[in-house]
Amino acid sequence: MSFKDLRSFISHLEECGELKRVSYPVDPYLEMTEIADRVLRAGGPALLFEQPKGHSMPVLANLFGTPKRVAMALGKEDPLALRDVGELLAFLKEPEPPRGFKDAIAKIPMFKQALNMPPKTVSRAPCQEVVMTGDDVDLTKLPIQHCWPGDVAPLVTWGLTITKGPRQKRQNLGIYRQQLLGKNKLIMRWLSHRGGALDFRDFQEKHPGENYPVVVALGSDPVTILGAVTPVPDSMSEYAFAGLLRGERTEVVKALSCDLEVPATSEIILEGYIAPGEMAEEGPYGDHTGYYNETDSFPVFTVTHISHRKDAIYHSTYTGRPPDEPAMLGVALNEVFVPILRKQYPEIVDFYLPPEGCSYRMAVISIRKQYPGHAKRVMMGAWSFLRQFMYTKFIVVVDEDVNCRDWQDVIWAITTRMDPTRDTVMIDNTPIDYLDFASPVAGLGSKMGLDATNKWEGETNREWGTPIVMDEAVKRRVDDIWDELGIEQSPTL
């Protein structure tokens, strides 16, 4: 099932018991966060706060609060089915040449589908049903969530920031948090390596002294939202990728104030510009690490136009110590990454980003080891292959007999198959998440790789241990007589 807009997805979730309407008045200042956090930690539904205090616009929270709902947003019922999305991305990133005539014929539909999904431009769109300009622009009328007691101001969290640079043929979609600064001002917190920041830098070089047009879309259809956080090939737009997943071209409409194209069915659109040199101190804010981050200076986004649908819905989230919504997204998108990594490194059996590792700061990889030093090659490959893993601080590599998603198994492998000196890889002065205050320099720190695989000749001079395994016939015999033993419960094996 595909969803043309956020409202159709909300209706589907409600029918499936995956969304709860909250009619009791709830304050966007702290209360929504506490409620959403309790519900998410219990594996509960998405929440639609129908009466946010002080505002007439309802607030949608916890939309992607479980891996199941992430899968549902992409038209799947099971998170494991998201590997199909990963297979598609792996193909788009590196299409295999046909192995023969029959294979070429078989691949035609996939190539044709990929080429036929550019966005569809429409002249009128729901996101422009209500338009405000000039003095009518007032961001404080939006029920922007103030998430934590130490946050400096309300924070826009789920906005799709749309930019275009002079070096790119396509638009870029990115999700960057935005601090409310005034009735028509937001702080655009994009890190220097992110697409929006790179577009802005290129624009400044080519058009010095000119305002840079920017648009932010809130409440877009779920596939377009998730397209902005998946590893889409650089040559493909997020709109085209969303169309591929949806099986229908993404409808876009020209912005009111510039040539950027925005998702036509979005709930709210903020249009404006970033003036050269206009910066402001951003933060502190509670973040996905579970800590308040440092303050720093970022560009100011001046909003000149606000447009929205009639009876618009404001889409929001919070970030905090895992589990939070970004962590749940990470668990689901983990399945997307597996086929992409396997395409480049077929020896990879499984890949896991534990949510308690703040989505991406730790990875565990199981491999079919083929030669001495193999684990180190896989570490280096994972760190460098996808931009999403450039901030991964710790990588543990285990053999295929170890379940990389089971900490008991992983810790057993680390403590029995590793020598701390021989099997630990340390790399200094690498890119690190700006929010990682544990690094000695902002944005620059070290990485650690742990080779927890069985060691081969050349890696050790010792006779290697043989794992203890019970005889299968004995296990079957005990299974057969278990009920006769009078033992109430069989341990999980």
Curated annotation (Swiss-Prot):
One of its GO terms (molecular function) is metal ion binding. GO terms for cellular component: cytosol; plasma membrane. Prenylated FMN binds at I175, Y176, R177, R189, W190, L191, R194, G195. It is a peripheral membrane protein. Mn(2+) binds at N172, E238. It is found in: Cell membrane. It comes from the Bacteria. The active site is at D287 (proton donor). Its cofactor is prenylated FMN; Mn(2+). Pathway: Cofactor biosynthesis; ubiquinone biosynthesis. It catalyses: a 4-hydroxy-3-(all-trans-polyprenyl)benzoate + H(+) = a 2-(all-trans-polyprenyl)phenol + CO2. Catalyzes the decarboxylation of 3-octaprenyl-4-hydroxy benzoate to 2-octaprenylphenol, an intermediate step in ubiquinone biosynthesis. This is 3-octaprenyl-4-hydroxybenzoate carboxy-lyase.
